[in-house]
């Protein structure tokens, strides 16, 4: 929660208010679909820290599970993680889930603007090492606020969405 999912969607789509942004963790409580050209960006509730009841958290878990288990083609999932912190047990559990269900995914490390230059390389390497065993295709260092890494992520997503020749 509160890693900047909605902010990154807005930045990727070049739209300021496409996804609702809040400073309070846990505000995304439903699955939100955003159609951009021929693709859908899907903003899911976060699975980490949020001041919500256990009942709400269980409902979010069911919602997310039902979304992933539905019979639909997912080109790629972008797991957003806060670049300032090491991957949590919840982060790794999500990677295990994605790997087990053969859902192709990449990791976008958010809030890179909050890191010192010297920390960026170290964090990127730590996350690459952590994510690799779970089939993570790539790790991107991003900042929705400054635009860092957004174009690289956008190009990767465009390539994933391109029709196969």
What function would you assign to each model-found segment?
Residues 56-84, 96-108:
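Inter-motif core of Ras-like GTPase G domains
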Residues 1-51, 55, 162:
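Conserved G1/Walker A P-loop phosphate-binding module
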Residues 114-165:
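Canonical P-loop GTPase G-domain recognition
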Residues 25-28, 33-35, 40, 68-74, ...:
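Conserved catalytic network of the ASCE P-loop NTPase/AAA+ motor domain
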Residues 86-101, 121-127:
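Conserved catalytic-core segment of NTP-binding enzymes
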């Amino acid at each position: 929660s509160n890693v900047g999912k909605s902010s990154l969607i807005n930045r990727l789509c070049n739209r300021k208010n496409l996804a609702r942004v809040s400073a309070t963790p846990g505000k995304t409580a439903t699955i939100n679909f955003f159609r951009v050209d021929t693709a859908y960006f899907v903003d899911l509730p976060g699975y980490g820290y949020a001041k919500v009841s256990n009942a709400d958290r269980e409902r979010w878990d069911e919602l997310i599970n039902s979304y992933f288990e539905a019979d639909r083609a997912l080109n790629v999932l972008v797991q957003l993680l806060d670049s300032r912190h090491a991957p949590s047990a919840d982060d790794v559990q999500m990677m295990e889930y994605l790997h087990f269900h053969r859902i192709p995914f990449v990791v976008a490390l958010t809030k890179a603007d909050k890191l010192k230059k010297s920390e960026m390389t170290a964090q990127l390497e730590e996350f690459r090492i952590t994510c690799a065993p779970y089939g993570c295709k790539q790790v991107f260092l991003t900042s929705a606020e400054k635009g860092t890494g957004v174009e690289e992520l956008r190009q990767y997503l465009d390539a994933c969405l391109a029709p196969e020749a």
